[in-house]
Design a protein with these regions (language model features):
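Vicinal oxygen chelate
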Residues: 2-5, 11-19, 63-72, 74-77, 88-105, 107-161
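Short solvent-exposed loop/turn micro-motifs enriched in small/polar/acidic residues
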Residues: 9, 57-59, 125-127
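Residues within well-ordered alpha-helices
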Residues: 24-25, 62, 109
Length: 161
């Protein structure tokens, strides 16, 4: 069943904040019998334009993705500046951080969640799309993330562009 409010029922990601992304990725890989994922660093501020609590931040994270069925486990090791990832790690230790829904119409969905009393805590860009985290911990037990992927322009071949 599709959520009319978010326009999707597709959970695409479970985010886990960790102190050591390599060790945690190795442990998950061994447990699930999956290959060790690539560890990469999120984009720099000039591209990502990350905002935390309404202000620009140079926050980054070392990250790895493990695909399990149609859901990715996203492992995030905070690097540096203030972020929701740092807050989670400092307050709760390694723990589940977010559940992500893939959506279209980021502006409308952000406004809807704001109207529902959920405060935007962090947002940014990445190659191929954008994300927004909402402070839903007290109400839902987890941070809510919206992910919007860029769509290829009509009439273009995604494989060659």
């Amino acid at each position: 069943m599709t959520s009319e409010a978010l326009g999707t029922s597709r959970i695409v990601q479970v985010g886990i904040v960790v102190a050591d992304v390599e060790a945690t990725a190795r442990a998950w890989s061994q447990l699930l019998g999956l290959p060790m994922p690539e560890i990469r660093l999120t984009d720099e501020f000039d591209f990502a334009r990350t905002e935390y609590q309404g202000a620009p931040t140079f926050a980054r994270a070392r990250m790895a993705f493990l695909s399990v069925g149609q859901v990715d486990f996203e492992l995030l090791e905070p690097v540096g500046e203030p972020s929701t990832w740092n807050d989670q790690l400092q307050q709760h230790g390694p723990s589940m951080h977010h559940v992500a829904f893939e959506i279209t119409g980021m502006g409308d969905k952000r406004a809807y969640l704001n109207d529902q009393g959920l405060k935007l805590i962090q947002s940014g860009e990445y190659v191929g799309g954008r994300y927004a985290y909402f402070d839903s911990q007290a109400r839902l037990g987890v941070v809510l993330e919206l992910l919007e992927q860029d769509r290829p322009a009509e009439g273009t071949d995604e494989a060659t562009d």
